[in-house]
């Protein structure tokens, strides 16, 4: 298993065993720590940031026709075989949208993706790297992603 999480401790390392357990319990190939499933929560985000993130995930779900509530989540447990089967050199996105592309790639390769609720805490130090270029990459990129070929 390979884990991904934010380096600023917005994700609670104590939740790592829950991600691992959920992969095993639900026979999931990918387990996503989700802010937007029942029981999930975001702590200390302004309402505008919350709604922007929530509706961005809704947009992705509708455009890509995937059933993941938190498409930009960065707290993930992958089975090793998932990452070995995805050509990481062929990932198009460099901003936050790579989170979307990785989940979509896993689904297109036939892997089972499961979400579990987490409590996401906004960073206490530093600033978000979100900017208009990253937003544009995600917004337009999701439309382009529909036509990407997956082997």
Report residues per predicted region.
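Charged, amphipathic alpha-helical interaction segments
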Residues: 38, 108-111, 143
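Acceptor/aglycone-binding surface of glycosyltransferases and processive sugar-polymer synthases
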Residues: 1-3, 13-96, 123-133, 138
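Catalytic donor-sugar/metal-binding loop of nucleotide-sugar-dependent glycosyltransferases
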Residues: 67, 90-94, 103-120
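C-terminal, non-catalytic tails of nucleotide-sugar-dependent glycosyltransferases
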Residues: 140-151
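DNA-recognition element of transcription regulators
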Residues: 100
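Secondary-structure boundary/capping motif
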Residues: 79-82, 111-112, 145
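The conserved acidic donor/metal-binding loop of glycosyltransferases
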Residues: 6-10
């Amino acid at each position: 298993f390979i884990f991904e999480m934010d380096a600023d401790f917005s994700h609670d390392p104590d939740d790592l065993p829950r991600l691992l357990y959920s992969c095993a319990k639900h026979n999931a190939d990918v387990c996503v720590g989700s802010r937007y499933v029942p029981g999930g929560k975001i702590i200390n985000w302004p309402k505008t940031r919350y709604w922007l993130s929530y509706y961005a995930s809704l947009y992705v779900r509708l455009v890509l026709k995937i059933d993941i509530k938190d498409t930009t989540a960065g707290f993930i447990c992958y089975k090793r075989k998932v990452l070995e089967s995805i050509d990481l050199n062929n990932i198009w996105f460099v901003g936050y949208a790579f989170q979307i592309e990785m989940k979509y790639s896993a689904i297109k390769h036939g892997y089972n993706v499961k979400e579990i609720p987490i409590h996401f805490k906004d960073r206490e130090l530093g600033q978000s790297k979100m900017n208009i270029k990253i937003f544009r990459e995600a917004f337009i990129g999701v439309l382009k992603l529909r036509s990407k070929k997956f082997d």
